[in-house]
């Protein structure tokens, strides 16, 4: 097996960790901005296979990352389920809201999502053909809790108050929504794999707001269900889970869910994560602070070396603790890659 990313996901400790970055196709790259302008708007870019494939390939051409991640958005799935979705300039995504059981039952079934998502699958097929043979192709979806927070509130929020309120005041409606999203997520990811994705990543951006039993019920349990269902259909499929800001919840997350790798944010130190999460055997992904992609310089070099050193005694995929920001300097990414690969 020559793909370093797949070797790490199978538990191999490598002398140089494979590297890719969350949001590596993004606004910090001039070529991305040009392609997005050509598309007209963000959703058109997601739903135009040639252009979505192009922006996925751009950072691979520029940096030679070990993995490419499908260019899409976690909110395409709720849109395919029937939610209205739009993006407001400077404000981010907006959606129609679901506040009760009637809203849940009005959603489409899991087998009715594929017409809307067909362009995403076509993007996957293009990339499976065009990516370099050494580059691993990652598909992805949002985890049910995070997707549900947007569907309930109609927008992102810092505290996910609307979702917590529905969870605590109308548990049947909340659980029905989680079930509907979980089932659809399984079908969506299965289609991505059938179209050529070699790995899938589960993004639970707001997992950190789930505490105690809620974390077990609504972060761990849905992840376990999705992972087990996908692995039953696609034996050997590697899965990366990212329960962002889970803190102590990162410990044992891979074992509890069946994920092959747990991605870690930069709110925990690499040394803590190496001891408590990686423990010499569990593949971890992370966890450089994205700020260094803006600031650069010797600080970037030293922080990068610290992450590599912390995780060098077990399987590790180098990434950031969160997505690269639009303010990042493309030259700092070059410096990052050169530092890791010892050039």
Curated annotation (Swiss-Prot):
It catalyses: uroporphyrinogen III + 4 H(+) = coproporphyrinogen III + 4 CO2. GO terms for biological process: protoporphyrinogen IX biosynthetic process from glutamate. Substrate binds at residues 23-27, 73, 150, 205, 322. This is Uroporphyrinogen decarboxylase. Homodimer. One of its GO terms (cellular component) is cytosol. Pathway: Porphyrin-containing compound metabolism; protoporphyrin-IX biosynthesis; coproporphyrinogen-III from 5-aminolevulinate: step 4/4. The lineage of its organism: Bacteria, Pseudomonadati, Pseudomonadota, Alphaproteobacteria, Rhodobacterales. Its EC number is 4.1.1.37. It is found in: Cytoplasm. Pfam families: URO-D. Belongs to the uroporphyrinogen decarboxylase family. It comes from the Bacteria. The gene is hemE.
């Amino acid at each position: 097996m020559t793909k370093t990313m797949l070797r790490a996901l199978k538990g191999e400790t490598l002398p140089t960790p494979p590297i890719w970055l969350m949001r590596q196709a993004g606004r910090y790259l001039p070529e991305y901005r040009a392609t997005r302008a050509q598309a007209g708007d963000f959703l058109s870019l997601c739903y135009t296979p040639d252009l979505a494939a192009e922006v996925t390939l751009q950072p691979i051409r520029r940096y030679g990352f070990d993995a490419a991640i499908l260019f899409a958005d976690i909110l395409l799935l709720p849109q395919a389920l029937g939610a209205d979705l739009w993006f407001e300039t400077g404000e981010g995504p907006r959606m129609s809201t679901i506040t009760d059981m009637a809203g849940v039952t009005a959603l489409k079934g899991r087998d009715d999502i594929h017409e809307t998502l067909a362009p995403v699958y076509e993007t996957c097929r293009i990339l499976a053909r065009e990516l370099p043979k050494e580059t691993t192709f990652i598909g992805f979806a949002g985890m049910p809790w995070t997707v549900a927070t947007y569907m309930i509130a109609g927008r992102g929020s810092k505290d996910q108050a609307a979702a917590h309120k529905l969870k605590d005041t109308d548990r049947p409606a909340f659980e029905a929504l989680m079930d509907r999203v979980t089932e659809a997520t399984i079908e969506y990811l299965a289609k991505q794999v059938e179209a050529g994705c070699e790995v899938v990543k589960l993004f639970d951006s707001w997992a950190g707001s789930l505490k105690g039993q809620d974390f077990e019920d609504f972060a761990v349990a849905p992840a376990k269900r999705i992972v087990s269902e996908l692995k039953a259909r696609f034996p050997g499929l590697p899965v990366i889970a990212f329960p962002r800001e889970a803190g102590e919840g990162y410990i044992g997350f891979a074992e509890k869910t069946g994920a092959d790798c747990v991605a870690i944010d930069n709110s925990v130190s690499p040394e803590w994560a190496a001891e408590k999460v990686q423990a010499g055997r569990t593949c971890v992904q992370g966890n450089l602070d994205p700020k260094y992609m803006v600031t650069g310089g010797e600080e970037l070099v030293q922080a990068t070396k610290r992450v590599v050193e912390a995780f060098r005694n077990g399987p590790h995929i180098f990434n950031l603790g969160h997505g690269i920001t639009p303010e990042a300097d493309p030259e700092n990414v070059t410096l990052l890659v050169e530092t890791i690969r010892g050039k």
